[in-house]
């Protein structure tokens, strides 16, 4: 730390968890306090700006590329910083929370990159926040091998050369970390806590390993938010004596407003940017959030009916690939969330074919890599990208100059021919309750109906219920979506779960709370910006 650093550290307000003192050292807490002092006020201003922009979208019912940044888009001369060697080849990336078992499995998976997730696939209990930091630090020092006490299975890292490169995803700007306050008494943003602790403890070690501190930035809504991250990176590197430009960040384009500012986001982060990623559920969730009162033309069908080949989704991914390659950045495709069944090979065969077709399409479209949720899908995705890339690390030379996407095409959401169905509504209720219940118990990555679901799934599920009710949607069976119908479905799901699980297991869960929270955010007249905010109030630990 520099001589000008404040002497007052951030204050821990949580009961101690194992090995907490290794993470929350005095110097680390001082670093967090300084991040908070310098950058939380700007974070707060940008969150307020989100609300103002939402109000503007509500008034106009549309979005457009920004006229004030047209010069950035028109300037052909600028590029993002070259990718470091460890991020040249990103053809398959695996995602998952940073618990010890996932850490070993992901690093050993054969994927080129592991997205170590502190965001949507991690419920932010204090124990999860601290243990995730410890898992990364232990992995970088090769002291993470362990034997599971329940299963007796041993987990051990392969040689360094065979391990995936870690790209860590902190929480989004909206989430607080209630267990840490600054000297001013203000609660620290979870994003600054996750980034700050990871960077403080591991940046130097990663450089010694020939890699670096690499991050995924979630839920950005504007280039001003990217500018804030860039300023944080510059400050953090200077404070710890890390060379400027060492950090690399990949931005998830998972909000509709960010889709209109992809070039500007890369420009703001150009010293540190390494790519953009195309999300799906959070992107659709963002469309509903921003255009929820824009009329029937913005009512989406069942979420599973909206594929990446829907015209408005294709416009988004085509523009992302073109933007990335024009500026020298990697374009990373979306998630394959299938979880293989150990009992039903037919389910696996059909799902693997679907994953293969999806990854074939992404590789053919010019993406440089893609995401999977399970190690068994790594070879499937790898085959798709190997067929296109061969021994090249990426295909950034495919500039896709033939692509031309208009502002209107990005929000032509009425293009899918599908319509809301009774099965889709029931699925939204069932998945919403099941996911929220697990999240409230501290689990953020949950296998539901053969898919690995995270908070984005719960967000799109509850948002669709809210949208269909408020739009007066009539399902394909002639039934109108009403609060009474949703309550009936939710009560039926609780009854089915009680019967399936048995009284003792059901009572040990948090099913009634999950049911109540889903109904609260799905049925309230006022749309909740994020499900995870009221859920965090109920999260214990």
From Swiss-Prot:
Superkingdom, natural source: Bacteria
Pathway where it operates: Carbohydrate metabolism; glyoxylate cycle; (S)-malate from isocitrate: step 2/2
Keyword set includes Transferase: yes
Residues in coiled coil: none
NCBIfam families: malate_syn_A
GO cellular component term of the entry, any: cytoplasm
Primary location: cytoplasm
Record carries keyword NADP: no
Active site positions: 169, 454
Name of protein: Malate synthase
Alphabetical keyword list: Cytoplasm, Glyoxylate bypass, Transferase, Tricarboxylic acid cycle
EC numbers: 2.3.3.9
Catalytic activity: glyoxylate + acetyl-CoA + H2O = (S)-malate + CoA + H(+)
Chain's gene name: aceB
Alphabetical list of InterPro entries matching this protein: Malate_synth_C_sf (IPR044856), Malate_synth_sf (IPR011076), Malate_synthA (IPR006252), Malate_synthase_CS (IPR019830), Malate_synthase_TIM (IPR001465), MS_C (IPR048355), MS_N (IPR048356), MS_N_TIM-barrel_dom (IPR046363)
PANTHER family: MALATE SYNTHASE, MALATE SYNTHASE 1-RELATED
Pfam families referenced in this protein's UniProt entry, alphabetically: MS_C, MS_N, MS_TIM-barrel
GO BP annotations listed: glyoxylate cycle; tricarboxylic acid cycle
Family named by the database record: Belongs to the malate synthase family.
Compartments reported by the entry: Cytoplasm
């Amino acid at each position: 730390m520099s001589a000008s650093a404040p002497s007052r550290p951030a204050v821990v307000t949580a009961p101690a968890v194992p090995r907490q003192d290794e993470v929350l050292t005095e110097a680390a807490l001082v670093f967090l306090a300084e991040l908070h002092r310098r950058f939380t006020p700007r974070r707060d201003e940008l969150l307020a700006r989100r609300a103002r922009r939402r109000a503007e979208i509500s008034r106009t019912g549309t979005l457009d590329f920004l006229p004030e940044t047209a010069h950035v888009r028109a300037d052909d001369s600028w590029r993002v910083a070259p990718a470091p060697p460890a991020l040249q080849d990103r053809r398959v990336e695996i995602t998952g929370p940073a618990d010890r078992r996932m850490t070993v499995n992901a690093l050993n998976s054969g994927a080129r990159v592991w997205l170590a997730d502190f965001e949507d696939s991690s419920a932010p209990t204090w124990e999860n926040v601290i243990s995730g930091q410890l898992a990364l630090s232990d992995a970088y020092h090769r002291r993470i091998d362990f034997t599971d006490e329940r299963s007796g299975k041993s987990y051990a890292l392969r040689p360094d050369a065979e391990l995936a490169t870690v790209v860590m995803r902190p929480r989004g700007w909206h989430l607080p970390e209630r267990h840490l306050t600054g000297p001013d008494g203000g609660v620290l943003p979870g994003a600054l806590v996750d980034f700050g602790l990871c960077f403080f403890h591991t940046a130097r070690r990663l450089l010694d390993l020939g890699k670096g501190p690499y991050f995924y930035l979630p839920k950005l809504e504007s280039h001003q938010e990217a500018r804030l991250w860039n300023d944080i990176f510059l400050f953090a590197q200077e404070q710890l004596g890390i060379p400027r430009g060492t950090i690399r960040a990949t931005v998830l384009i998972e909000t509709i407003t960010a889709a209109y500012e992809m070039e500007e986001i890369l420009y703001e982060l150009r010293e540190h940017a390494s790519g953009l990623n195309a999300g799906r559920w959070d992107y659709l969730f963002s469309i509903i959030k921003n255009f929820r009162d824009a009329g029937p033309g913005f009512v989406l069908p069942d979420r599973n009916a909206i594929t990446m080949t829907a015209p408005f989704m294709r416009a988004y991914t085509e523009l992302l690939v073109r933007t990335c390659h024009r500026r020298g950045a990697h374009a990373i495709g979306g998630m394959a969330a299938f979880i293989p069944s150990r009992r039903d090979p037919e389910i696996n065969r059909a799902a693997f074919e679907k994953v293969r077709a999806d990854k074939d399409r992404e590789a053919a479209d010019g993406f440089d890599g893609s995401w999977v949720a399970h190690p068994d899908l790594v070879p499937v995705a790898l085959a798709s990208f190997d067929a296109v890339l061969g021994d090249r690390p990426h295909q950034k030379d495919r500039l896709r100059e033939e692509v031309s996407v208009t502002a209107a095409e990005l929000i032509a959401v009425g293009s899918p021919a599908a319509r809301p169905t009774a099965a889709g509504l029931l699925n939204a209720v069932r998945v919403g309750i099941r996911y929220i219940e697990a999240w409230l118990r501290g689990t953020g990555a949950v296998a539901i109906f053969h898919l690995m679901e995270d908070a984005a799934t719960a967000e799109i599920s509850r948002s669709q219920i809210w949208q269909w009710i408020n739009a007066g949607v009539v399902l394909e069976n002639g039934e109108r979506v009403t609060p009474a119908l949703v309550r009936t479905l939710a009560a039926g799901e609780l009854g089915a779960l009680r019967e399936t699980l048995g009284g003792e297991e059901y009572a040990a869960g948090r099913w009634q709370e999950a049911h109540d929270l889903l109904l609260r955010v799905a049925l309230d007249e006022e749309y909740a910006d994020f499900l995870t905010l009221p859920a965090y109030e109920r999260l214990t630990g």
